[in-house]
Amino acid sequence: MPRRLSFRLAAVAAQVLPGRAMADVGTDHAQLPAWLVGTKSVPSAIGLDVAEGPLRVARKAVSAMGGGVEIRRSDGLDSLVSGEVHCVTICGMGGFTMVEILSRGLPRLTGLERVVLQPQGGETAVRTAMLFLGWHCVEAVLVADRTKRYVVESWAPGPSVMPWSEADLRWGRLIRSGPDPLFLNWLAQERADVELGLSRLSAASMEGHPDAAALRKEIDAIRAEEARLV
């Protein structure tokens, strides 16, 4: 039986297309593709990573499975052949790195049915890029894992029917569409962090500093989002 996934990776796995070949970019130790194949969620998987150390560990981990998972050295999507998988996951890396991988690998996105993304920050940049590249968001979830919160979003080919607002790009249109206690907690923590920054400027007698005005605007935006949800 494959190793149990963390809450974060389990949320990613739940959005992978069942019964369809997949590839995991930045696979590290190939835990996600090994779990998906081991549980027969997908028929085959490719683990892609640029670092030789994790690749060695990944190859050793999947060698006892008897097939189904291929480990391949790749800088982003570079070694993926267009059409050989139907779903791609990219998890656990910064959003701006994700944008660079997706933009550079655009030809290899042709024929994909789903891209599942879990950025570590930079979510606004990722959403903006996916919309620009002609994809639309079809599923999204917030997940708490230990002391951190993560966003997992699935994208399908084809442009978004409706334009995204600034708030949609910041927090995620589908995240905003449903009453999620975790989202409310996230907003409250985000507001508390910004208020702390503002109080420090006030303590330093810097209320008139441009940064203070920006923080007050930030607080107003978060409060408006909180008010919309209650």
Task: Give residue spans per PLM region.
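Conserved SAM-binding motif I beta-strand of class I
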Residues: 44-49
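Conserved SAM-binding loop of SAM-dependent methyltransferases across substrates and taxa
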Residues: 29-41
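S-adenosyl-L-methionine
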Residues: 1-20, 34, 56-83
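Class I S-adenosyl-L-methionine
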Residues: 2-7, 78-79, 84, 96-230
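Short SAM/SAH-binding signature in class I
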Residues: 84-92
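Conserved class I S-adenosyl-L-methionine
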Residues: 19-28
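Conserved SAM/SAH-binding beta-strand->alpha-helix loop
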Residues: 51-53
